[in-house]
Amino acid sequence: MLRVVVESASINPPLSTTPKAFVTVYFRDMMKRTRVEEGHDPIWNETLIWHLWNQPLENDSFLKVILQDSVSKKKERFIGLATVPLKRLAQRPKEVMFVRDLILLNHSMKPTNCTVTLHVAQIYDQDTEMTGNEELLGSTVNEVTQKKLMVSGLPMHRALASKPQHFQVRVKVFEARQLLGNNIKPVVKVNIADQQHLTRIKMGNNPFFNEIFFQNFHEVPAKFFEENISIEVVDSAASRSKAEIGRFQTDIGFIYHSPGHTLLRKWLGLCQRNKTTSGVRGYLKVTICALGVGDQALVDQKLPYEQNTRVQIFKSKEVPVSLAYLQFFIYCAEDLHFGTHKSATPVLEVELIGDKLRTKPQNPSDNPIWNQILTFQIQLPCLSSYIKFRVMDCSKYKCQDEIGSASLCLSQISSTGEEIQGMYSGFLPCFGPSFLTLRGGKKPPFRTSEEGTCIMDAVQHGLAYRGRIFVEIVTKIKSQQDSVMKDLSQEVTQVEMQYYRQKYGLCVIFLSCTMMPKFKDLIQFEVSMGHYGNKTDPNYKPLVSTTQYSPVIYDGTTYHYVPWYNTKPVVAVTSNWEDVGFRMNCLNLLHITRDRLKTNLDILKSIRNPRDPALLQQWEKLLKELQEDCRRPLPCMTDQPRANSLDRNKWQLRSQLLQQLAQMAKEAKPVNMVGTAKEWLHRLNAVIPEPQESLPDVLIWLMSRQQRVAYARVPAHTVLFSPAGPLSSGKFCGKIQNILLQYPEGEGQDTFPASLRVCMWLGNVKYSKNLKLLQQGSMVVYAETYENQAKTRDDWGQQGLYHCPNFSDVMGRKALPKTDFKAPPGWHWKDDWVVEPQRRLLLDIDINKSQVLEEVYENQLRNATGAWVPAAIPNTDVNGQPVEALENVKCPQGWHFKKNWIVKLNHAVDSEGWEYGVGIPPSGLPQIWNSVEKTYHSCRRRRWVRVRFRNHKELGQERSQEQETLSFLQMQDLSEEGKEGWEYGTFDSRFHLDPQPTSRFRRRCWHRQLAPNKDRGVASIFLLEGSLAVEQKDQPRKEMEKTRSWQPWKDLRHTPEDPRIPTTPFIYYILNKPHYYQLFCYIYQARNLMYNQILTFQEPFIQVVFLNHSLCTQTLRSSAAPTWSQSIIFQHLLLFEDPKDTRENPPLVVLELWQHDSRGNKILWGRSMWPPVVWLGLQDWVFTPLRWHPLVRELGEEEGEILASCELILETQKLKELHPPILSIPCKDGIYLLPKNIQPTMKMMAIEIMAWGLRNMTKVRYPQLLLECGGESLKTEPISNFQENPNFPTSTFFFTVFMPLEETHAQPLVVKVVDNQEYGQQIVVGQANIDFLQPYFCDPWSLNYTTVKLPTLSVKKPDTFLDFVYKKFWFDSSKDEEVYEEEVDWWSKLFWATGDADKSLNYNHKSYHTLKVYDCELEAVLTFKGLQDFCQTFKLYQEKPKVDSPVVGEFKGLFRIYPFPEDPEAPKPPRQFSAWPEIEDFPQMCLVRVYLIRAINLQPQDYNGLCDPYVILKLGQTKLGSRDSYYPNTLDPIFGMMYELTCNIPLEKDLEIQLFDFDLITADDEIGSTVIDLENRLLSGFGARCGLSKSYCKSGPFKWRDQMTPSYLLYRYAKQKGLPPPVFDLEGDSLYYNGETFKLQSFESAPPTYKHLGPKKERLALYILNTQGLVPEHVETRTLHSNSQPGIDQGKIQMWVDIFPKMLGPPGPQVNISPRKPKRYQLRCIIWSTAEVDLVQETFSKEKMSDIYVKGWLFGLEEDTQKTDVHYHSLTGEATFNWRFIFTMDYLTTERACVQSQKDYIWSLDPTSTKFPARLMIQIWDNDFFSPDDFLGVLELDLSDMPLPAQNIKQCSLKMMETDSKWPFTPQKRISLFKKTNVTGWWPCQVLDGDKWRLSGKVKMTLEMLSEREALIRPAGRGQSEPNQFPMLHPPERNDSFLLWYQSPIKNFCYAVCKRYRSKIICLVVTLVIGFILLNFVYSAPSYFAMNWIKPQLRLSSPIKIVNLIGTVNTSNINSSILTMEGSTYHASHVFPEAPAP
């Protein structure tokens, strides 16, 4: 296969609208495309694969690469193309060809600045497990393969908002293979979120489903991504406990972030969940996609029942699939937060892809110890994004209350190895042992960024700290799983070292708090780290974790701020955590590398001009710093005793990546700089996340009225101190940083909470001895209490306090007597108590206001005579409180009045300003006021107002005023001044120093300063632990009773839960030396403010905010790209910071874009924030150049950008003497302009306009066009009769204008349509704003035609010896078959184009008749420029439109912009709109033919998951289509219809195609619709009116359909391009065109043999036309959309449109696209016999036997199941039947599928048509009388691709069913029964035994396929019934084995005994024979050995003589006679003569 990895691209010069780029790659006319990525430097790293099959690469092979921009509304914009020759790869197939920075060409084939980077390689079968159609069904146990399949590496997430959005999930189930089980009836359950969908029940182990399920969502993306998808295959015939066959699970987030949001045609391994013996139990082929608004579903062109999938992909080389087990070692938890519950029973729940396991419940404790192991079985690849942990409260037998949650990203605890280029294999998931932080409570707002690597980070978890869990994760790969849950034993002792804790100290200095909304109450900040510092947690020591209460002050424009000035509050929090410094050091080093790279990249991206010299300088700086950072070694983890497996694996991964990046930076060249740097940054971001950062984040809460309002989360590692050095410390450790606060989710969405500027330090307290965060200032620690007094009878004292204590805190909630304070350990009292007012609380409410409205109400009462007299209290405020009289109200110092008191008359009052009412006791104030006097009214009042203005002061006075404010805020002792320091007021109102006549309450603040003791080795502020006041248990009982009843007057609306609020000291950092600065902001322009480029900005202006100061630019008129060209100057800015600290971390400058709505209200559009450039002098100062900065909206989405720059200059002593401002900035009318050094350069540009006409405008009479650009305007002539001809009488216009030389700075072009009405009135009826002019810039001298490229003709190469051997000995499966050419039609062309049915079609002339199938709209094909090459369509809107404003019309036109010489004598460039269609030819009458092919994946509308679609066409007033012609019960209808319409273009130009769902009773629902602009197709120069065929045929099935011949088309094309007409020779085989001669032989290597081709002249002209990039004969795929779900894909429709203008002659012939009708076939299957069938029954003699019968059916036609008779008592597994099965099917030969139409239910209105593959199912069964029949085996044959049967039993085996053989010269023979219509032989049957398939029998069959006609000619009956012929089947001769026992018992007994004990008898006989031989040998061996040893040689010379010693016989006395041997007379020599004599 050929693999192309598309890495990245660079689009230069950048487009004003952020492009959504993708790359399309063509190889051998097969197109593949990448996903869409936003940005000018997109990075894909996406792999595209083409299968070469048996066609290897040749020297002339090439790739065509096209870079496109997917713009809005289904249009795509061409960017550039290039061709990559593959000659080098063909010659060196083992190498990888890297193509870096490939320069793209434009339409004129000229180089552009856009580049693409990719690499190409060839992959062979032995190198990968991927085979056939990119489907993976197994993998080996190779470690590298397993790790690379774990999770998707380097995910790229696009930013999503937190508001609910429309989403859609689709799951299409194709088929299953190799499902385990016997005689199963599988059904697939698809669970999407909580909705379950079921397929139809099928039969067999390889079922075919082809069903699709939809699920729509309207959810927040965070919740949508968390939902799971579960696909389960169950056996519907089995019991519920044994029904599950296998399942597959994933989460939607994983699918959404996959390429194309889709898993396309993937084989899923099915496994049983948590089963110890479970393996892969089958495979399921599915397509899963998750789509959002605007996402396009991938088009699957293949047939669902295509048979290209070979059996070998189901066979793995070593193991079926990679199975692994994730073991979770759950140790313990700590610091669990139970909320309102005092105790809970904690249980830890772990969730992985929907599977959940829980630990055992523990006793109620906040530190539970579980010590358990939870085991999950996973399949590699594990298609999940994260692991969830939840600690639940199960105290009430229900685990519903969640204590806290955490999550782990699989991509962060594992690696696929994709981060590093090379052989790095990654590592499997592992974690810990380490702590995970639990969170709960309020959630943060959802945001995802491109830098994120996990969508679950800080998304679904809360903000509040809920404790930590101590866990460990281990991945094991083994064949058998352990128990799901078990207890830990020895592992606990190995992790005890994790419990060692160290004391950490956290110090935070608050420097400023600005950009706040208005708070009526006092605010304070709380800092916490875990539970430490949380005031509401009583389990921890009180710490100095909160600041003093402060008010918020108005800044003079929009926001408020906290007036800290030189007194900065400080908090100090101590905590105890384990030592993770070794881990944080590595993380901080990586963050330094990433941050410096990102900073340099942002600067690089902001330089839009490629000719800017700063571009290369910044690139060199980036490379230099990256090399320095990457060569810095990371702390080694191999020698770290506390490091775990994940630490070591990540250290290895990070180290190798840094080494690789350093080398790449060293070799990098200045090409595609932004894209290369973005790729490096992306790879760094992938390895940076540290999941084992067990330290919780630092939380800063903004609190008001004891409620947490807004928060900021600071990662602990960013402020952590490291003794290893500053590089290992956090980037903000001891440094000033800017923090933006956020509201929790769902709160405060309309305001900005605050912008904080803080300095933080976190570290081990032993390193804090010499802690000094700021370079100047001193720290003050003091205790505080307030003395309270009330006024009773004109005397101040404690008598009138009632519920308020004598001494309390600032809120009056707690008693704090001075005698109860005690110094904390390590500190002592420095002085005695002194009175020091908190002047921050006493600031004037009118500070920073330029004008104040004062009001006094004059009150009168009606006396007894009815006259009005002054009331008892004549002057009050609006609430009735007494105030001074009008004449006594004095103007404060520094203010003045312009007008005196006047009566306000602009509300419901009478002519004198009085309003009347009836007084209601006891207050006497009326509840309702009326403007008309009645006799019963008892009182009246009127409102007197006046405005006072602040005096304007000079520079010196301003400084003195600033010093006054500072001196007022300074803390000082008042005892020496004779003042007592009392503050007058109430807790509900503001306190002030001056008493008022109505004052009844006063208080004063007492301070006592603390001083640290002698040095203790740590910073003294970390010793401030515990409460300063005496605990309540130490107080007297009376005092305790008194404190219980204390109430702070009337303002205690929120009381704390614990009344014992701890008393802690307050810490302040005093900075007495201020520094003054001047800030210069240069603002030029804002653009790209709307993605759809519709709305204009009404009176926009920019507000610049810097700390507590803000200024605004001038307000402009309405504009889509407002240009201010203005400088904003802030003078005398006061900062209490060291200038070096300010230069290193300056405050942020905030630019806010505002506009006005129709009511005049200000609306915030977006903000842009960045730090200014700081200059501490003007020695090296230069102007800061303008840069583009993104505008961020309220939810974090970047939309729009602003061109600006800022610089902050310190006012040194020399600069203070200069007149402000210190820089010379030009000023005009009081407005500072941009300095000339940074203004864009202007140049004269020519703008040509081709104004074609107006469309779809109603109620206009004489419209005309008005164009405005850069202060210049142009008007066209009005259209005289708009209703008859909406085109302009003159189409081309020209004018010049001065524009910026840089295209990115071009001013917008405004197109207005002005209607001339009666009496000369002109009204603007429509407007379009074109602010993106870059596509219209052109080179006027370039040529506008495409050169003809001659094709490279292939030359047949001579066969080599290996080729000869291959062809000689390779047995092709189709070698012996005749060439099969079936009848071709238009559908054949479609299948040739989509690649379907390749095996079934073998048409010799296929190459002559090809068409192009586009998977998108024709307008979306990049090469055709949206069919708007002649004129573009601009939507017209109202003059002041809103977001939902409708389109009021369209303007069709085009623009060309190019430099124009200012010298009148210079040559003028040629006009661009010279050769265009004659405008007099329009309107035109046209004949339109609409060919509707089919629809794909329509949205279901009915309850059965289907719909009944029908088509309605609308064109002008014409409407075609009928609801009666609906297609019942289908989501993929095949229309095959042609509609013919007549229209008048352009009056009738919009063709609307609607699909409706037919409903019998209710109204029909619209499925979706699509609109085609016919005028664009008619006018386009790409010939879109009629696609160009590949061949010119005068007759035949593919007859030329255009109304013009190719030669005339070529003549018109040359005329359109301004070229001379082509000239043909007399014979027509040569052509002179555009200065070149072309011959027909250049395109045809040999004379064509196809008989229907036309003459040579036309063929040659057609060849030339096909090289010009014209629209070919095609089928386009259009997306359907519906108003019910805007932006969501509702399905696709494939179609094409032909347009024939009547002025060009009669139209061409129609194309017959009628759907193919299936042919009826009859399959006759004769079951002759079986053999070697398993025997499953026992006879009386324990003999195995079976009663065999055979069952068969066609797949999908299970209701027509047939079976043979029963062969009883088979003792050998042999059975004879002679039985005929007859099956009838409707078969589509071209699609290789059977078609069936039947009703699902009796009450169904229409039948449902289904297609399924032609498969024959044969099963062997054992017949039982009482119990269910036993299943013995199954055979499944695909009739279109089946193995050739064996001719004898011995050759029949399971190897026949394999598609590929192990040996290349012995392939398995495969046939199609539709071609070879009759076969006979043996086939194997198999049965599942355990988890493996084995041979269970063999069946001999004859399969015969007959057409319907042949079946009528040769009729036959089923079984053995009549007509029993062809052939005649006789009943088999079967002997009843049961009766044979009685007929020949001895014979049968011997047979039974021999059969049963055959082996035993043979063994016994052999044993007896061997035993007899051995016994005989043992018996004879001793004698033989003895004789052999002795060797006797016996020789006898004479016999032995016997002598009668008695002499005579005494017969009378026999008893006395004795016979003796005379041995004494003979010698031994007589016996042995050889013996020597004695």
Curated annotation (Swiss-Prot):
Any single Gene Ontology cellular-component annotation? plasma membrane
Membrane spanning residue stretches: 1961-1981
Which positions bind Ca(2+) 2?
1502, 1557, 1559, 1565
> Is Phosphoprotein one of the keywords UniProt gives this record?
no
Can you say where in the cell this protein is located? Cell membrane; Membrane
Record-annotated C2 domain positions: 1-100, 145-265, 307-424, 1055-1186, 1225-1345, 1467-1587, 1705-1853
Binding of Ca(2+) 3, residues: 1824, 1827, 1830
User: Could you tell me the keywords of this UniProt record?
Assistant: Calcium, Cell membrane, Membrane, Metal-binding, Repeat, Transmembrane, Transmembrane helix
Q: Which InterPro entries match?
A: C2_dom (IPR000008), C2_domain_sf (IPR035892), C2B_Ferlin (IPR037720), C2D_Ferlin (IPR037723), C2E_Ferlin (IPR037724), C2F_Ferlin (IPR037725), FerIin_dom (IPR012968), Ferlin (IPR037721)
Keyword Transmembrane helix part of the UniProt annotation: yes
Induction / repression: Up-regulated during myotube formation.
Q: In which tissues is it expressed?
A: Expressed in differentiating myoblasts and myotubes.
Question: What quaternary arrangement does the UniProt entry report?
Answer: Interacts (via second C2 domain) with EHD1 and EHD2.
Q: Which family does it belong to?
A: Belongs to the ferlin family.
Q: What does this protein do?
A: Plays a role in myoblast fusion; probable mediator of endocytic recycling for membrane trafficking events during myotube formation.
Protein name according to UniProt: Fer-1-like protein 5
| Species, as recorded | Mus musculus (Mouse)
**Lineage, please?**
Eukaryota, Metazoa, Chordata, Craniata, Vertebrata
Task: Name the gene behind this protein.
Answer: Fer1l5
